[in-house]
A protein has these predicted regions:
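Conserved G/P- and acidic residue-centered "switch" motifs that form tight phosphate/ATP-binding loops
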Residues: 100
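Cys-dependent protein tyrosine phosphatase-like superfamily
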Residues: 1-94, 107-154
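Ser/Thr-glycine-rich phosphate-binding loops at phosphate-binding pockets of nucleotides
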Residues: 104
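Short cysteine clusters
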Residues: 97
């Protein structure tokens, strides 16, 4: 897969700062910085690629989440802390799962909720950024519960 096809799979929910994509292949990992990716969050339920992230010295966080399922509130807290720390260093962060549409969309929408967006606003922002987002009912419910937990109205 070429650099341009890798760039085409990348989408930004906060332009140039926070985005999503499908899982990068081993040969793409060394080129991530060329398309503006400084740090990664893997939400795959297996540790694939983590050793490659270490070898290429790209900052990463692994928050294993089963496909079609929701993360935990604790995972969202870890995610927010990692993203905020990377942003403080002027680094962009990209989240990936297998396809970059369900778990990735859930985490990115959750981040917006932690910053004050309602669940509805966060889901709409994710869908505008990537119309192929396919959140499951459990993921939508989680985002609504997170919004309520954080005191943000629906």
């Amino acid at each position: 897969m070429t650099l341009s096809s890798l760039a085409e799979s990348l989408w930004w929910i906060i332009p140039g700062k926070l985005g999503g994509m499908r899982k990068p292949t081993a040969d793409q990992i060394p080129t991530l910085s060329q398309i503006g990716i400084d740090a990664l969050v893997s939400v795959m339920d297996d540790p694939s690629n983590l050793d490659l992230y270490e070898q290429t010295q790209i900052p990463y966080l692994w928050l294993p989440t089963t496909g079609g399922q929701s993360p935990t509130v604790e995972q969202i807290e870890q995610f927010q802390q990692f993203v905020d720390a990377q942003h403080a260093l002027a680094k962009s962060v990209v989240v990936h799962c297998s396809s970059g549409r369900r778990r990735t969309g859930t985490f990115l929408a959750a981040y917006l909720i932690t910053k004050g967006s309602s669940a509805r606003e966060a889901i709409q922002a994710a869908q505008r950024a990537n119309p192929q987002i396919e959140l499951r009912d459990a993921q939508i419910s989680f985002l609504q519960e997170l919004s309520s937990h954080l005191g943000v109205s629906f």
